[in-house]
A protein has these predicted regions:
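A residue-level marker of the well-folded mature domains of exported/periplasmic proteins
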Residues: 1-219
Length: 219
């Protein structure tokens, strides 16, 4: 098994797939960095007769197989939790992941669907922190300066961002009045929930997705 990391760069990922194709590998598993920009990788692999499997994220072009979770549903569950905790009324902020990546697109759709069902909930602001804890902390600090006590909840499209937002709120002395909810159920987030700091996170079986992708490649 040969593993490479595109670091969020769709163009770099395409180059990596092209390298694997030139090496005549037996199969390729890809976690697409973006839905559209990574679609050519699917076309190139198929043209070379090499099976390509998408793991965790989709592309516009259909791969030979896809293994992943329902990102829309995970966001719906998270935002429904927020709505219930706020009694269907309040101001929410949303931190996005990497723009154009399936998880970002679908989690946005799921969250917006629930907000549409709760007309007394207002989306104060939404920006990307690119799945990153440090970027999320900086963004949350800016939001605290901009919105202050208007903030009732923050929905972060992954746990890394949720933990960054949490740190900013704690340092500003604002956490007691603001819900922080993420997605993925990473170890740090689960511990934070157990410790009564972060409010909730949605489970995503990353290990199961990876195992499923390997099994699909062997088939």
């Amino acid at each position: 098994l040969t593993s490479v990391d595109a670091g969020g760069d769709a163009a770099k990922q395409l180059q990596q797939v092209e390298t694997f194709i030139s090496q005549k590998v037996d199969a390729i598993i890809m976690q697409p960095q973006e839905q559209e920009a990574c679609s050519p990788a699917i076309d190139k692999a198929k043209a070379a007769g090499i099976p390509i499997i998408n793991c965790n994220s989709l592309t516009i072009t259909e791969p030979d197989a896809y293994v992943g979770s329902n990102d829309s549903e995970s966001a719906e569950i998270a935002m429904t939790y927020i709505a219930k905790q706020l009694g269907g009324k309040g101001n929410v902020l949303m931190m996005h992941g990497h723009p154009g990546q399936t998880a970002e697109v679908k989690r946005t759709e799921g969250a917006m669907d629930i907000l549409a069902q709760n007309p007394d909930m207002t989306l104060l602001d939404e920006q990307t922190a690119d799945w990153d804890r440090a970027e999320a902390m900086t963004l949350m600090e800016n939001w605290i300066q901009a919105y202050g006590d208007q903030i009732n909840a923050v929905f972060c499209q992954n746990d890394e961002m949720a933990l960054g937002a949490l740190n900013a709120l704690v340092q500003a002395g604002k956490k007691d009045n603001v819900l922080v909810v993420g997605v993925d159920a990473i170890d740090d987030a689960l511990q934070s929930v157990k410790d009564g700091k972060m409010d909730a996170t949605g489970y995503q079986d990353c290990k199961g997705q990876a195992e499923g992708a390997i099994e699909a490649a062997y088939k």
